[in-house]
Design a protein with these regions (language model features):
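Short amphipathic beta-strand and strand-loop transition segments with alternating hydrophobic
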Residues: 71-75, 165-168
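Flavin (FAD/FMN)-binding glycine-rich loop and adjacent Rossmann-like elements that form
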Residues: 1, 14-15, 19-24, 91-98, ...
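Short beta-strand element of the conserved SAM-dependent methyltransferase core
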Residues: 73, 85, 130-134
Length: 361
């Protein structure tokens, strides 16, 4: 969301401006500046954000279909014509001129029969997050202390991941704990089983925190677990693939639609992850070509299912650039109309998303 350094400029605008302004006015945000990521991390009250999103959707007059599951997609050649959806209240058909694949797992692209990729070198691990309440903010261990203790005591407490952290939300007596690793397979029984495994891991982390840091966490309890956090599972084969070399070099593409300075953050082993932060003046970009399935005329992907290699995707699947990708996808489909997103005026698209690529105020 922000450039590197302790007070980097905001990189993503549009609805991001509205979220930061309105949640900030509610006291529902906390800005963590600097630290291991060398950037500004925005902590938020998850209830306040979810209600903001729901109200934004309602006020925009968007027709919603809650709890629907995609069962199939009907095609006419390179175009998706209609989606087959199931809800507990009955089946539904959804026809549209264009579609955004923001499913995370490229479900729309996959169900339509277009090419997709999966991690080639083993799984990318997900995380079961939890929010603790009743902590003592003044007695929190440092991140380095927590990691060293977790590594030393992992066998005793049955910890899988040893390099996690607990981010305190000042003034609320709460902490966001990110200290688990679970596989997130694309198979219904396995992913369901692993969701329970993730909570079991989180409970072991809580036991570790309460036992090893009783002054800080002794009176804490779980406020919420949330759904399993899925990082990288399956993504589109795009017109262009973003590479780790592009990320490290800060390649600015002629069709760039998003930017970020977030580190390479590849969770490719159970006990830890690759963490490669960048300098204060670093910036890397997401090309529109990586949002467009190479075989499709009316799909644009957004979020963690765009086309990138494992390491590149690990750096651009975070919230700031994902918001920018969503905006770019909507504008691209608007420009395409009943035509193909493969043939839109990229210069016109760049003008529409300029704030998310060029703005520096």
């Amino acid at each position: 969301m922000f450039a590197n350094g302790t007070h980097g400029v905001q990189l993503t605008h549009g609805i991001a401006d509205d979220i930061l302004r309105e949640l900030g006015a509610q006291g529902a945000l906390h800005y963590r500046r600097g630290g291991p990521s060398n950037t500004t991390v925005v902590m938020y009250d998850e209830i306040a954000l979810s209600r903001w999103v729901e109200e934004a959707v309602r006020n925009a007059g968007i027709t919603v279909l809650l709890g629907a599951v995609l069962r199939g997609a009907a095609r006419d050649g390179a175009r998706i014509r209609e989606l087959d959806l199931a809800t507990r209240y009955g089946d539904a058909k959804l026809a549209a001129t264009g579609f955004v694949d923001a499913t995370g797992d490229a479900v729309l692209t996959w169900e339509a029969g277009f090419a997709c990729r999966e991690p080639a070198d083993g799984p990318v691990y997900g995380t079961q997050m939890m929010v603790l309440e009743g902590i003592d903010e003044a007695r929190q261990p440092t991140r380095a202390e927590l990691t060293a203790r977790a590594r030393a005591k992992a066998a005793l407490y049955g910890l899988v991941r040893t390099d996690g952290f607990a981010f305190v939300f000042p003034g609320r007596g709460t902490a966001l704990v990110n200290h688990t690793h679970v596989e997130t397979p694309l198979e219904p029984v396995a992913v369901s089983s692993n969701a329970l495994l993730g909570k079991a891991q989180a409970d072991k982390v809580l036991h570790f925190l309460k036992s090893e840091y009783p002054d800080a966490f002794g009176q804490s309890r779980v406020r919420s677990y949330g759904l399993p956090g899925i990082r990288q599972t399956r993504w589109i084969v795009g017109r262009q693939q973003l590479t780790v070399e592009d990320v490290r070099a800060g390649t600015k593409f002629s069709d760039a639609v998003a930017r970020t300075a977030w580190p390479i953050e590849l969770h490719d082993r159970p006990d830890g992850y690759i963490w490669e932060p960048f300098s204060d003046n670093h910036m890397h970009y997401v090309p529109f070509g990586s949002l467009v399935p190479a075989e499709a005329d009316n799909i644009v992907a957004a979020g963690r299912c765009i086309d990138g290699d494992n390491a590149a995707l690990s750096s651009v699947r975070v919230m700031g650039p994902c918001i920018a990708m969503g905006a770019a996808a909507a504008h691209a489909l608007d420009l395409a109309g009943s035509g193909s997103v493969q043939q839109i005026d990229v210069a016109a698209l760049r003008r529409r998303v300029r704030d998310n690529v060029e703005r520096t105020d």
